Structures are given as structure tokens and as C-alpha cells.
A protein has these predicted regions:
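Cytochrome P450
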Residues: 1-398
Length: 398
């Protein structure tokens, strides 16, 4: 961390689940620092929990002002488009979120849990039938959330593969060219337009049907309809898949932790929360926000019009909030992590993701108690050039 000038950010290429030491130095010495991301202008990076929470939740920081701007600091070639719920501020954000939230109520998520269990059981049945070794990324981590969010949105099973490929490109930082990313987003928008037309002709009890009805009542524009579909599809499966694959990798690379969960399955809910806190899922990129007025963050005055990036990965390792933050503690009780963000943009699907992670982990422990990696942990291949870090493959046996 430099005290003068601008530091390149992200600090370095992610290495497995390591958190770059520059975050700890920043929290200690310079919790708000000037950085330059691969695309866009310079901005502030905040690394302490309290400042990160402020940026995420304070209405003086705007996401809408970052939408569609070429000068927005970012790690992806393409700027976040306008019309997405991720790129809105209240009251527009509140209007759209209320509509979508009906599909993610606690009751609806609770009712969907048995279906999640059925999907997991089916995937594990197939893994058991084929026998070891198995790639848990391809056989479980990816197909589970794809199936869950697809069923909630009303995507036919035969179409699941289409948006799996699309979303991998939409989340690209360097793995694909800008032209490929733009084409992928356009293709996904086109598919969602087709799906909306299908649901218009034959409505169902699914989220896309509800969004189409809202659009036809003039409560949702065509752009909002398609961008919301993209957000739900990509956010609803890629992040959960990456989190689950990284979680199993972490547990199997520390066999004593896997054994603890096997012996004490009642710890799974708290283990999922600790996995969410401990795993730095994002590879360093975050949505920039713009200050709409001067805001004091610690000793730094962020001027109106300046961009700020908040690192939840760093906040989740802040020793001002978490005891022994670099320890992976499955019995941790005080755990107010920010893995799902905060403020009005806190992840809508947080409870759905928690449910999927819990069901999948509980089932894996029960069905394959002796699960282990087939290669040394340091030889497991990881994805590169994408927003979310995760094993590319997770070869296991039992």
C-alpha cells in the first residue's frame, strides 16, 4: 500500500482463497486510499468494515450515477448497464425490488426447500451411480443453483445450458474480449425476451410470469424486464455455484474441519455463515458508487462526484469486528459478515442461497462422509479472468 499516489487495483491476481496482504495494511494504515482499476477513472477504495458498511448503506452514495458510464471505475470491459436493479437508487430501485421480492419471500424460499432437496438428491444419486472420481463443480456446484433459479424463473430444463454459458461470459474480466461479453449480454437479453413472450402466452406460477404481468401493467419497462432477468439468472446461479465449490474445497483442504461437520452436523448453518465470511468470493471487483455530496469517511473527505469502491472481502477480515478474523472457525457465533452486501442493495436471494448451501452441504456430508480430494489442494485448478473466484474443477473421491 502506498501513501502517496494511486495504487493499481485489484492488488494482485487472486491465489486460491488467499486475501491479499495489502488489505490488512490498508485497514491499519490507510483505510480509504486512491486506486486505479483496469477500466475507468481513479477512485477511492475503502477497506474497514465500518466504512464499507457506510458506503453500502448510506444514500449519499449512488449506484445509479455509475450506470452506463465509460469513466466508471471497474474491472470488467463493459460498464454496468442502466435499467438493472443493480444500477438504481431509490425510489426506482424500491419499486423494482418490491416486485422481485415477492418471489423471494421467506415463505416462498421455505416452500422451495423440499424441491432443493430433491434436486440435490438427484444429482448425488447420479454421482453415486457413476462412481468415483467425480468433478463436484460440473456434477453438483453448477447444476444445483442453475436448476433452482431456473425453476423459480420458469426456464425449461432443456434451456438451462444456454444461460450457463452466457453468464460465464457476462462475468468475465479478462477471459473474454469486450466484443464477446457484449455479444453474450445481447444473446442473454434476446433469450429472456423469448422467455417473456412464452410466459405472456402461457403464464405460470413463476417469477418471469410475475415480471411479465408487471411489464404489461406498465409497472416495468422492457429494458427493466430483461435486465432484471439477467440479474436474477446470473446472480442466482453463478455466485452460489462459486461459493459452494469454494466451500467444499476449503473444507476438504482442511480435513479436520470436514470431520468436525461430519461429527456435528448441527453446525452446518453456522458453518455456512463462516464460509460466507471467510471465502473472498469476489476477485477484487466491486460496484463503484458515486458520492452525491461531500462525505467524511474516517480521516478522508470524499468529495461530491468522486467514485468509491467498497471491499466486502476486506471488511469480512476486519479485527475491529471479528475475533481472529483470519481463522476459519466453524463455531463462530458473532458473525455479521457482509458477504451479501448491505443497505438497499443487500442480496435479494440471500435466504435462497443459504438454503441451497445448507441442503447441499448437509446432503454431501451424509451421502459421502469420507469425501476427499483426489489431488493435493494446491494442484486444484482455479478459474481465471472472471469476477468470481472458484475452483474450475473439484476432483473428489470417497
Amino acid at each position: 500500500v502506498t501513501t502517496v499516489g494511486t495504487c493499481p487495483y485489484p492488488f494482485g491476481d487472486p491465489v486460491r482463497l488467499d486475501v491479499h496482504p495489502s488489505y490488512a495494511r490498508s485497514r491499519a494504515e490507510q483505510p480509504a486510499m486512491r486506486v486505479r482499476l483496469p477500466y475507468g477513472d481513479e477512485c477511492w477504495l475503502v477497506t474497514r468494515y465500518s466504512d464499507v458498511k457506510t458506503v453500502l448503506s448510506d444514500s449519499r452514495f449512488s449506484r445509479a450515477r455509475a450506470a452506463g458510464r465509460e469513466d466508471t471505475p471497474r474491472v470488467t470491459p463493459e460498464a454496468a448497464p442502466a435499467g438493472s436493479i443493480l444500477s438504481m437508487d431509490p425510489p426506482e430501485h424500491s419499486r423494482l425490488r418490491r416486485m422481485i421480492a415477492r418471489g423471494f419471500t421467506a415463505r416462498r424460499v421455505r416452500e422451495f426447500r423440499p424441491r432443493t432437496q430433491e434436486i440435490v438428491d438427484g444429482l448425488l444419486d447420479e454421482i453415486e451411480r457413476v462412481g468415483p472420481p467425480a468433478d463436484l463443480v460440473e456434477r453438483l456446484a453448477l447444476p444445483l443453483p442453475v436448476s433452482v433459479i431456473s425453476q423459480m424463473l420458469g426456464v425449461p430444463p432443456a434451456e438451462h445450458h444456454r444461460f450457463r454459458d452466457f453468464s460465464a461470459m457476462v462475468l468475465s474480466t479478462t477471459a473474454f474480449t469486450r466484443e464477446e461479453v457484449v455479444a453474450a449480454r445481447a444473446g442473454l437479453e434476446e433469450y429472456l425476451g423469448e422467455l417473456a413472450e412464452q410466459r405472456r402466452r402461457v403464464p405460470g406460477d413463476d417469477l418471469m410470469s410475475a415480471l411479465v404481468a408487471a411489464h404489461d401493467d406498465d409497472r416495468l419497462s422492457e429494458q427493466e424486464l430483461r435486465q432484471t432477468g439477467i440479474t436474477l439468472l446470473v446472480g442466482g446461479h453463478e455466485s452460489t455455484a462459486s461459493q459452494f465449490a469454494s466451500s467444499v474445497y476449503l473444507l476438504l483442504s482442511r480435513p479436520e474441519r470436514w470431520a468436525l461437520l461430519r461429527e456435528r452436523p448441527e453446525l452446518v448453518p453456522s458453518a455456512v455463515e463462516e464460509l460466507l465470511r471467510f471465502i473472498p468470493l469476489g476477485s477484487g471487483g466491486a460496484f463503484a458508487r458515486y458520492a452525491v455530496e461531500d462525505v467524511q469517511l474516517g480521516e478522508v473527505l470524499v468529495r461530491a462526484g468522486e467514485a468509491v469502491v467498497a471491499s466486502t472481502n476486506s471488511a469480512n477480515r476486519d479485527d475491529r469486528v471479528f475475533a481472529d478474523p483470519d481463522e476459519f472457525d466453524l463455531t463462530r457465533e458473532h458473525n455479521p459478515h457482509l458477504a451479501f452486501g448491505g443497505g438497499v442493495h443487500v442480496c435479494l436471494g440471500a435466504q435462497l442461497a443459504r438454503g441451497e448451501l445448507q441442503v447441499a452441504l448437509e446432503s454431501l456430508l451424509t451421502r459421502f462422509p469420507d469425501l476427499r480430494l483426489t489431488t493435493p489442494a494446491e494442484e486444484v485448478p482455479w478459474k481465471e479472468g472472471t469476477l468470481l473466484r472458484s475452483p474450475r474443477e473439484l476432483p473428489v473421491t470417497w
